[in-house]
């Protein structure tokens, strides 16, 4: 069944919980205490400018977005696009790009190189030159690259057949799959690498943690197994199908197609539409800001969580008109008058540029300009 699901996803896209867990009623109290200040902050408001093929994008289906100083990179269905000085430059297979469909992007802050995960290999853009890595010419585990993350001299890659790591100093590749890690399935949808920990988002196999110092792998599962009903809400990872992961300030933010999770190394706190401000449990991507704040990209809009309150930004699901709503800790939802919204409700990528936000959607790229 999972293989059938995976095939569908490719077409559309081009064990126990670790550590002791307290009762659900207490599991998120430390998180609430840390987030007390967030309750007094106004939720961000934006004026959205949208980019489509009408104003320079090579394709309206945008899988990923990356902020690189004043440059904005967009991975689309039909090439890699970079926006600089109010103009777009497009890279495609004729320029050396591995494949026209660019699923993921990462920046090497040391060198300025941009890494692009595609449907047929991994490409590096460096000073206008593109080098491509595939199963045939490198140690890449699979040519379908869902995620990429750079940590110092290491490039971590999430693929349809496990994960791998390229050491840029030695040129050596290391492969990680069901043979040398606890993953039950090998479809790795996302990776978040830092000097201390690396996290893998695995389709059907939960969340994997790699300790950079000890070389040890740990695995975090949904205590409900593959049951779509949530029996133990804050007892562990919300679901086995993990689509995205973000590790920031020693906090893990995980996205699944059945809700979201936050983990501080001891306590879990899960997010479901029935008891929070998420517009949908179907989460494509997640981007942590810090220990308390995160952005969620769902199939029904862009959502922001400040540790207590929620905001949702989207075209209305019924009228298509720009819409923003705010939800407080008591569950009160308040509409906010706005005149702009992200290009589409189906959000696939998120990145930040100062106080602004860039959003990759199924129908265009959006720039949210923070308003006072």
Please identify what each model-predicted range represents:
Residues 19-372:
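Carboxylate-rich, polar loop motifs that coordinate divalent cations or form catalytic acidic clusters
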Residues 4-13:
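Sec-dependent N-terminal signal peptides
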